[in-house]
UniProtKB/Swiss-Prot annotation:
Expressed by the venom gland. This is Phospholipase A1. One of its GO terms (biological process) is lipid catabolic process. Keywords: Allergen, Disulfide bond, Hydrolase, Lipid degradation, Lipid metabolism, Secreted, Signal. It is found in: Secreted. PANTHER family: LIPASE, LIPASE MEMBER H-A-LIKE PROTEIN.
């Protein structure tokens, strides 16, 4: 399983090198069409919704039309907080990292977790090897995925009386930008802003040179938290209210030499799950003071990565030291 993941991301990385160097040098990356055939199609029938609560962990598949069959959606109101999880290119909501992230959320704070499985539009089901040629299509599909998330959000707010303050989005790679487009759409619908969007190593190719309106942006939610773990598959640019650069945003400890970039890119999801599961937080030190020891951090200047980040007053870019194994924090995770 791990070898297949490594091979997938290696092929993706090789392709990105070619695309970035040859294809995306000029013009709007989102308008570039490498493939004009019906590959990686997006429509409401190609997206599955997986809903998890403490009472129901079956991970059954739903659509917009069948949501009302889930026990939670049979209620007149939904009172628990909601988290959307959105995967990235050639991935799915059924990959181990995303299952673990959903489980951590449900176990921690009794969230209702809604995982958006857009694997068809993310090119996951295309022919092996060739699927990586269709990345531009998947990148364009992120806007449609965002609109889909916004449609579910509208249902939650209008029919189930959930406050936008109780809805958070978490997206990895292309899923981070899809979350950003959802944030833009709900504002267009006059629903307000999501309480938070967490971008887990947002994808760099097709988005790095884009204006705020064409990618995940700080204005897409009340609070936008970005976790940077790679500098080629993921962007190095500051995008959020807070930007955490784990191990300086590249070459994550424990990822080895040969698959460092691809392993580092996926490590963002693992870090978030560990931050939720364990009290030991990964501590962000202001980049301007990155040489100072963690032991000297105060709650006024340093920030814990994860669900509690927005409780800290500091904003901006942060360096986060990490260890090579879970739970990855290199001390007891306390800020004085």
């Amino acid at each position: 399983m791990e070898e297949n993941m490594n091979l997938k991301y290696l092929l993706l990385f090789v392709y990105f090198v070619q695309v970035l160097n040859c294809c995306y040098g000029h013009g709007d990356p989102l308008s570039y069409e490498l493939d004009r055939g019906p590959k990686c199609p997006f429509n409401s029938d190609t997206v599955s919704i997986i809903i998890e609560t403490r009472e129901n962990r079956n991970r059954d598949l739903y659509t917009l039309q069948t949501l009302q069959n889930h026990p939670e959606f049979k209620k007149k109101t939904i009172t628990r907080p909601v988290v959307f999880i959105t995967h990235g290119f050639t991935s799915s909501a059924s990959e181990t990292n995303f299952i673990n992230l959903a489980k951590a959320l449900v176990d921690k704070d009794n969230y209702m977790v809604i995982s958006i499985d857009w694997q068809t539009a993310a090119c996951t089901n295309e022919a092996a090897g060739l699927k990586y040629l269709y990345y531009p299509t998947a990148a364009r599909n992120t806007r449609l995925v965002g609109q889909y998330i916004a449609t579910i959000t509208q249902k939650l707010v209008k029919h189930y009386k959930i406050s936008m303050a109780n809805i958070r989005l978490i997206g990895h790679s292309l899923g981070a930008h899809a979350s950003g487009f959802a944030g833009k759409k709900v504002q267009e619908l006059k629903l307000g802003k999501y309480s938070e969007i967490i971008g887990l190593d947002p994808a760099r190719p097709s988005f790095d040179s884009n204006h705020c309106s064409e990618r995940l942006c700080e204005t897409d939610a009340e609070y936008v938290q970005i976790i940077h773990t790679s500098n080629y598959l993921g962007t190095e640019k500051t995008l959020g209210t807070v930007d955490f650069y784990m191990n300086n945003g590249k070459n994550q400890p424990g990822c080895g030499r040969f698959f460092s970039e691809v392993c580092s890119h996926s490590r963002a999801v693992i870090y978030m799950a560990e931050c939720i599961k364990h009290e030991c937080c990964l501590i962000g030190i202001p980049k301007s003071k990155s040489s100072q020891p963690i032991s000297s951090c105060t709650k006024q200047e340093c920030v814990c990565v994860g669900l509690n980040a927005k409780k800290y007053p500091s904003r901006g870019s942060f360096y986060v030291p990490v260890e090579s194994t879970a739970p990855f924090c290199n001390n007891k995770g306390k800020i004085i």
